Amino acid sequence: MTQPPAAPARRIGMAAGEASGDLLASLLLKGLHARLPRDVAYEGIGGARMAEQGFASHWPMHKLSVNGYVEVLGQLREILAIRRELKQNLLADPPMAFIGVDAPDFNFNVEIAMRRAGVPVVHFVSPSIWAWRAGRIKTIARAVDHILCLFPFEPEIYARAGIPATYVGHPLADEIPLEPDVEGARSRLGLPLGRKVVAVLPGSRNSEVKLLGPTLFAAMARMQAVEPDLAFVLPAANAMLRERIDAMRAEHPGLHLWVVDGQSHAAMEAADVILLASGTATLEAALYKKPMVITYKVPWLTAQIMKRKGYLPYVGLPNILSGRFVVPELLQDDATPEALARETLLQLSDHANAAFLREHFTQMHLTLKQNMADIGAQVVVDLLRGRGKL
């Protein structure tokens, strides 16, 4: 690996670990650019969206984008090496501040080192301590000066532990329009206007697509056998995943499938129903007011470990935020092609449920719409001023 260039006079260190963190960080960067001097540089680990905001990533973000206990073990040496190099670079010339974006298992270690060096630390995105690993809050107290929360119930949890926290809303609620433009999205993607459309989102990680992709393709084939006029749209998160998806598509040549590069928001906006992997995309689907079926698969050993952790009864963000099941979840052994096809077609035909979800998700959207970029950036600026960094 080439060594990063010499550090600029004023910089803010940041580290994001996957596509959702890249999006969150890019929006926060917009807010920071509007408030901080132009000579402040932003560098560390990030993705393409952060790069569009002038961020310099010295390590490839995709190296950190690994899900599951077993999968992490396979990449652990490389991940630890990247973290060690990042800390060395930051400690050699401490930045004005460090912002860890999600990726808590990676970032908390870096954040603790930064705080010990006197660097103000903000962590963006509360870990799901309300779902599992509540004991992690002690680590968070050591790691951060302030935590930015995406959901309204989270700051109270941190207040009880004496950790400064601010509800910033969810940036996706600012980005996604309250009223989806279905016809406009279909036109942009070249999809037929007069047919039912199912968007299929297998995830943004290679390991997710590898495990879940074949099942989703088999489910699409079953749905098309029942509803021959269905159209499917599948956004590929990156070029590497596009190759894997194209290979799976070749095994189902008769599918009425449009594979698009990126454009996941347009795909969701264009859809009547969404079949998707658990993750941030489930919240995006809710913000587009769509019926959905949530699914997920991890390797067997990872699943056994997860079962012992005491999770909430649901994994999808629409259900977590609702405090109950409002959309179906089919996970692990329940995620068969037959079950996924059956449940997706049921969602497609249940017009009363679709109307309920439109209203329910509209209220959720209004709650989460808080102008995150401005609120989050102001927290960072206030912390910097309070510590004499500006």
Swiss-Prot record:
Stored Gene3D superfamilies: Glycogen Phosphorylase B
One Pfam family this sequence matches: LpxB
Homology family: Belongs to the LpxB family.
HAMAP family documented for this protein: LpxB
Function: Condensation of UDP-2,3-diacylglucosamine and 2,3-diacylglucosamine-1-phosphate to form lipid A disaccharide, a precursor of lipid A, a phosphorylated glycolipid that anchors the lipopolysaccharide to the outer membrane of the cell.
Keyword Lyase set for record: no
Any GO BP annotation: lipid A biosynthetic process
Protein name: Lipid-A-disaccharide synthase
An annotated GO cellular component: membrane
Known EC number: 2.4.1.182
Catalytic activity entry: a lipid X + a UDP-2-N,3-O-bis[(3R)-3-hydroxyacyl]-alpha-D-glucosamine = a lipid A disaccharide + UDP + H(+)
Keywords, in A-Z order: Glycosyltransferase, Lipid A biosynthesis, Lipid biosynthesis, Lipid metabolism, Transferase
Pathway as given in its UniProt record: Bacterial outer membrane biogenesis; LPS lipid A biosynthesis
Gene Ontology molecular function: lipid-A-disaccharide synthase activity; phospholipid binding
